[in-house]
Amino acid sequence: MLFRSQMVDNPHRYIVGFGMGGDENAFTLEDYAPAFNIAAEAGYPCTVHAGELCGPESIWDAINFLPIRRIGHGVNSILDAKLLDELVKRNIHLEICPGSNLSLSIFADWDSHPLPSFISKGISVSLNSDDPPFFHTSVGLEYINSAKHMNISLEKLKNISLMAMDASFADADTKSRLMNKIIEF
């Protein structure tokens, strides 16, 4: 298999994880399980895009068919209380991109965005920019807008940064060093 020979048999020090993004309607996650399993068995942590354009069922597919620790977006998990509980139970991290969610009309406005609910339910989340040039945003702007429009406190933003670093695919030394910088902030 080309994937195994390119990624697993010839590792590169800058390749630290495996993931898949794109239009969730264009593929089924189950079809990609073999590639994800090869990556996971080789020690690569995995992430996948789910629950942005499709409903909670795409997130269920992600956590049931793939060895993932993170989900790109995952915002439609808010529509399924059992799924929210499962995300907490499995400590699945959601890579939240409020700016793109609003630009794509997944949520009508800041008040309807589920980020505050995810935080209150104890779901691990991070703030992300998705596609900065396309959505005219940055990670910094996502933090500013989350504070301004969703009343996310500085302490909660700091905790989001800690959750992001904890869920990152960085090595333990890098994680520890960066988490200490966040704590000292």
Regions found by a protein language model. Give the residues of each.
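Short beta-alpha connecting loops at secondary-structure transitions
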Residues: 98-104, 126-129, 144-149
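Short acidic/histidine-rich active-site segments
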Residues: 47-53, 123-138
